[in-house]
């Protein structure tokens, strides 16, 4: 699958189902802990520096951001989970908004869950994975920041993530570096299989 970086657009930042765009395209949700690098991942996958706004401040994405990817699919950037500095009320609102989208959106075909390869999955990562599996959603795990660990340790770290999540047979895990774009084509091919 090839994507034209000049044909990417942010359609809407939505908080309610009635704001979701009706494009007829299938959707790929991107979920992950705050500061796991979702925006950086999106920018690197589509070959655009600042399409998805990146921030040093975790918890910046507070809406569902729908990106039209070259009229081939929609990326939906979901607010990061596990960020302690937002109020309990805000966390509950995010939770409801995300749950509504994930459980009711027919166009959603796969959830790409990003996990920092350097660390074991957090309790929030495990809860998110279990939640997605409860609703029978296919999950593609992307272990981000591969360039931050020694090459010889990648497989060990991937195995740790698999074991901690109790990754189901049909779900795939791929390591990725937004710095080198290593495995970018493998990820596009994996996403395409779900559409």
UniProtKB/Swiss-Prot annotation:
- Per its UniProt record, what Pfam families does this chain match? MMR_HSR1
Gene Ontology terms for molecular function:
GTP binding; metal ion binding
GO BP terms, alphabetized: division septum assembly
Q: What InterPro entries does its record include?
A: G_ENGB_dom (IPR030393), GTP-bd (IPR006073), GTP-bd_ribosome_bio_YsxC (IPR019987), P-loop_NTPase (IPR027417), Small_GTP-bd (IPR005225)
- So which cofactors does this thing need? Mg(2+)
**What does the UniProt keyword field contain?**
Cell cycle, Cell division, GTP-binding, Magnesium, Metal-binding, Nucleotide-binding, Septation
Q: What residue stretches are annotated with the EngB-type G domain?
A: 24-195
The family assignment reads:
Belongs to the TRAFAC class TrmE-Era-EngA-EngB-Septin-like GTPase superfamily. EngB GTPase family.
Q: Which PANTHER family match?
A: ENGB-TYPE G DOMAIN-CONTAINING PROTEIN, MSS1/TRME-RELATED GTP-BINDING PROTEIN
Q: What is this protein called?
A: Probable GTP-binding protein EngB
Gene coding for it: engB
């Amino acid at each position: 699958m090839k994507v034209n970086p000049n044909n990417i657009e942010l359609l809407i930042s939505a908080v309610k189902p009635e704001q979701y765009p009706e494009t007829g395209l299938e959707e790929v949700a991107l979920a992950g802990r705050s500061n796991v690098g979702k925006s950086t991942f999106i920018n690197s996958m589509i070959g655009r520096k600042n399409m998805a706004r990146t921030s040093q401040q975790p918890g910046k994405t507070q809406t569902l951001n729908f990106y039209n990817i070259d009229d081939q699919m929609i990326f939906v950037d979901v607010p990061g989970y596990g960020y302690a500095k937002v109020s309990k009320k805000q966390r509950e609102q995010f939770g409801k908004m995300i749950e509504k989208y994930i459980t009711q959106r027919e166009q959603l075909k796969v959830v790409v869950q990003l996990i920092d390869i350097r660390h074991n999955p957090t309790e929030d990562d495990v809860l998110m994975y279990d939640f997605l599996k409860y609703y029978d959603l296919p999950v593609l795990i992307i272990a981000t920041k591969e360039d931050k660990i020694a090459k010889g340790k990648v497989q060990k770290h991937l195995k740790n993530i698999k074991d901690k999540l109790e990754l189901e047979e049909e779900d795939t895990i791929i390591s990725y570096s937004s710095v080198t774009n290593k495995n970018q084509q493998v990820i596009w091919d994996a996403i395409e299989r779900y559409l």
